[in-house]
Amino acid sequence: MTTRLFIQDVTLRDGMHAVRHRITPDDVGKIVAALDAAGVDGIEVAHGDGLAGGSLNYGPGSNTDWEWIEAAAANLTHARLTTLLLPGIGTIAELEHAFRLGVRSVRVATHCTEADVAAQHIGKARELGMDVSGFLMMSHMTTAPELAAQAKLMESYGAHCVYVTDSGGRLTMDGVRDRVRAYRDVLDEGTEIGIHAHENLSLSVANSVVAVEEGVTRVDASLAGHGAGAGNCPIEPFIAVADLQGWKHNSALFALQDAADDLVRPLQDRPVRVDRETLTLGYAGVYSSFLRHAEAASQRYGIDVRTILLEVGRRGLVGGQEDLIVDIALDLRSRAGGN
């Protein structure tokens, strides 16, 4: 492989789910400074559900997106400051505000079958001169050809890159391979492809490696795997594998290891790992950020988290339906004869 990988860190966006969107701007600044010094190419900063994601439904943040982004911008020298926007949550006005604060790259995220709602936001980002990626979430929930058709739509709106986004950590290597190949078959040669993996089935590094072997150039990863569910692709082992494979990148392995162990792990109030709950996310194909919501419902209503997650998967809930987790817990308690 001769193409240089673009390593996109998501510790301070997807990782927000792991700490219930509670982190100080000071800690954001320290992590950004460490990532920047370690040579990552992009650093994504926002509430876990993107710009303006702080709410009762998704979970309020300890600070505003703007406070986090300002802290990041003040500690950035080389990396591309990035954010996430979900149309219907974040608005064009918020995208413009983020741009004024120094954000130069945005990932516009939709459910895997709803790319059409991203047209205006992608168009505005291009108008601002930003680097733009389309982010097709829960990519396991549709077929490879159907997903590729959605990727083609995002490309037509102006996306420079489109991601296979395994939000549920449900894809296996064949699933990743099929989707990347389907993208490559329909996307223009100049359009990049990205991979966003989760660790719920312990496959995030393997899936990311397979994606790169199939031509992916942008790889999402995070310090210590800090992210929703069992976490994202942990950046340290992925970079180690990239080194062993001889792939070109700009990241320094030891510096990333130090940042993961010294700065990120101490912030976690719940270990980010594969355990009985997070494995169930991947097994059931459930949106990884539902974990903390399901755990809260389990504690409140006395239903096993795994039982809740299996029912969430059976019903096919997608991002934005967090409020239904309580309804599911109540239904399960009623079926079990509880009051």
From Swiss-Prot:
Substrate binds at residues 13-14, 167, 196, 287. One of its GO terms (molecular function) is manganese ion binding. Mn(2+) binds at residues 14, 196, 198. It comes from the Bacteria. It catalyses: (S)-4-hydroxy-2-oxopentanoate = acetaldehyde + pyruvate. Residues 5-257 form the Pyruvate carboxyltransferase domain. The record marks 13 as: Transition state stabilizer. Keywords: Aromatic hydrocarbons catabolism, Lyase, Manganese, Metal-binding, Plasmid. InterPro entries: 2-IPM_HCS-like, 4OH_2_O-val_aldolase, Aldolase_TIM, DmpG_comm, DRE_TIM_HOA, PYR_CT. Its EC number is 4.1.3.39. The active site is at 17 (proton acceptor). Signal peptide: none annotated. It holds the Pfam family DmpG_comm. One of its GO terms (biological process) is catabolic process. Belongs to the 4-hydroxy-2-oxovalerate aldolase family. This is 4-hydroxy-2-oxovalerate aldolase 6. It comes from Rhodococcus opacus (strain B4). The lineage of its organism: Bacteria, Bacillati, Actinomycetota, Actinomycetes, Mycobacteriales.
